[in-house]
Amino acid sequence: MAAQRPLTIALVAGETSGDILGAGLIRALKARVPNARFVGVAGPRMQAEGCEAWYEMEELAVMGIVEVLGRLRRLLHIRADLTRRFTELKPDVFVGIDAPDFNITLEGNLKKQGIKTIHYVSPSVWAWRQKRVFKIGRSTHMVLAFLPFEKAFYDKFNVPCRFIGHTMADAMPLDPDKNAARDVLGIPHDAHCLALLPGSRGAEVEMLSADFLKTAQLLRQRYPDLEVVVPLVNAKRREQFEKIKAEVAPDLAVHLLDGMAREAMIASDAALLASGTAALECMLAKCPMVVGYRMKPFTFWLAKRLVKTEYVSLPNLLAGRELVKELLQEECEPQKLAEALLPLLANGKTSHAMHDTFRELHQQIRCNADEQAADAVLELAQ
């Protein structure tokens, strides 16, 4: 009698964040089904957990229209080859991790062949290009969503979706140790501390750094002991920021950090940041914040017409109200930013109330996401 085939899960991750999620999912599945087989497109973390890589993740990790166009033939070839090979393999479940432009079409191809498909990490369909929800519904048996309002959106369109919580909320403590973070960064325990996070993209750093620095100068007049920490994602962004600082605020003493955004947020009394995942991380670090964002006028005009949400930052979307101040476009200027940050640096009622709400929201999305994702995969595999 032929031996029963082990549980076979196919996965495709397209970037580092997806590799981290994939590795966590594989780990959780292996704990329950030790002989399971994992194949697909994997990064180093997924491979370290035992995923057989038919293609390296770097093949898919392209950003920007020009880069994508340059690699389009190769990407289309990989997708066609994966469709053929997965169809032959007939895995119990296919999991497309993020990379929606690549994965959702692949999921649709496989679903037509009778293979069960999951899309892990919802694209921001609730915010813009909402009609994508119909393609997602046709292509997948289940969407795994990090945030409760994402599930509410899919429910409206009868697309099966499971809220699993956010892996970042699992990884961060409910009560971070501010003094320990200050010790790591060399910040005195009794000083006022402000974190500036002008974004991870070159265009953001270019648009925001000067105003963020001028804001810090205004706040230093009010709080002479103010320590300013500026975590930057890589050497390129650091060089760009240093150049702007030399022109705008050469005499402002700041702590420039390579990475270490999380430590900077935990150590600080308040943060001024561009929107994006940084705002969620800042909320989980229990650091009161102001979101300041500016883009080119035409891009903003277009975004206002495309984006369907009342708020841009994740803490506000989670709270369903303006929990943190959002100052956009012409509102994003030093005087207004400083006025919004002053009550937070005072460390009084405003920041304590914000801290308490951040903690409640953290608990809402701290659901052991790796285990929840594994549950969803195994239920679909039955």
Curated annotation (Swiss-Prot):
Methyltransferase as UniProt keyword: no
Domain of life: Bacteria
Enzyme Commission code: 2.4.1.182
CC per GO annotation: membrane
Keywords attached to this entry: Glycosyltransferase, Lipid A biosynthesis, Lipid biosynthesis, Lipid metabolism, Transferase
Gene Ontology terms for molecular function: lipid-A-disaccharide synthase activity; phospholipid binding
Transmembrane annotation, as ranges: none
Reaction equation(s) it catalyzes: 2-N,3-O-bis[(3R)-3-hydroxytetradecanoyl]-alpha-D-glucosaminyl 1-phosphate + UDP-2-N,3-O-bis[(3R)-3-hydroxytetradecanoyl]-alpha-D-glucosamine = lipid A disaccharide (E. coli) + UDP + H(+); a lipid X + a UDP-2-N,3-O-bis[(3R)-3-hydroxyacyl]-alpha-D-glucosamine = a lipid A disaccharide + UDP + H(+)
GO terms under biological process: lipid A biosynthetic process
Residue stretches in coiled coil: none
InterPro entries associated with the record: Glyco_trans_19 (IPR003835)
Pathway note: Glycolipid biosynthesis; lipid IV(A) biosynthesis; lipid IV(A) from (3R)-3-hydroxytetradecanoyl-[acyl-carrier-protein] and UDP-N-acetyl-alpha-D-glucosamine: step 5/6
Top EC group: transferase
Entry-linked SUPFAM superfamilies: UDP-Glycosyltransferase/glycogen phosphorylase
The keyword Lipoprotein is assigned to this record: no
Signal peptide: none
Family classification: Belongs to the LpxB family.
Purpose of the protein: Condensation of UDP-2,3-diacylglucosamine and 2,3-diacylglucosamine-1-phosphate to form lipid A disaccharide, a precursor of lipid A, a phosphorylated glycolipid that anchors the lipopolysaccharide to the outer membrane of the cell.
Protein name per UniProt: Lipid-A-disaccharide synthase
Lineage per the UniProt record: Bacteria, Pseudomonadati, Pseudomonadota, Gammaproteobacteria, Enterobacterales
Gene: lpxB
